[in-house]
Amino acid sequence: MSRPGREHVILDRIRGTVPPEFADDAVRLYRTILAISCSRQRIRILNAKLDRRVALCGIKHCGKTRLGNALAKTLGLPFFDTDALLETDAGKPVRAIYKEVGETKFRELEAETVRKFIASAPSPAVVALGGGMVSNPVLTPDDLHALGMIVWMDVPVPTAFERMAREGLPPFLADKPDPSVEFNRICAVRRPVFRAAADAVLELPEVLPVEEAIDRLLTVLESKVISK
């Protein structure tokens, strides 16, 4: 019997067993328990197959840290953020580093941090990559491959810019006559780089609750890990 057929039989038995006034509540409870059970089984299977780090890349403020942290908690894995690691190494915020040393030196420092991470970090794990890290000229394709399975979070540019504007524009945009135009230009340059580097793409054309975004991300990972 198919799964839908089995579920139909079980629901009929529930409705036939409990008092009519409690039948709808009993059915809802059954479906909640079933959903939790399926979710746990899904995570167990993915954990058993996942043998690499999951590295989330994408434009600045696409939600890598938020979603990466949530994914790590869902899978019971450690979480890292390359910007946070760089801040720890330098002893100051990423924006301050960039403003003080300029982009060329910033990319060199970023590459040092990433290579140190590759050499020492556990695997599997989840890591959020800095917005420009995939296009860092100091890093090689081998460096990117060593980070893990790269998943590109493809979000609309206006969504990311709106989030960034709320927090305050970074140095590379703050002095531009039209920051939104410059951000669009940067994103247009980086999109093909993200696509070329990515092992998988997570498309997020609309703003979603984190639970729904995680569900989509799990589906993407399953397509790459379980089917191989």
Where are these regions (language model features)?
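Pre-Walker A (Motif I) flank of P-loop NTPase domains
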Residues: L50-V54, P122-P124
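P-loop (Walker A) phosphate-binding loop of NTP-binding proteins
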Residues: I59
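NTP-dependent small-molecule kinase module
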Residues: V54, A70, T74, H145, ...
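A glycine- and Lys/Arg-enriched "phosphate-lid" helix/loop adjacent to the NTP-binding pocket
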Residues: A146-R191
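Walker A/P-loop
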Residues: T65
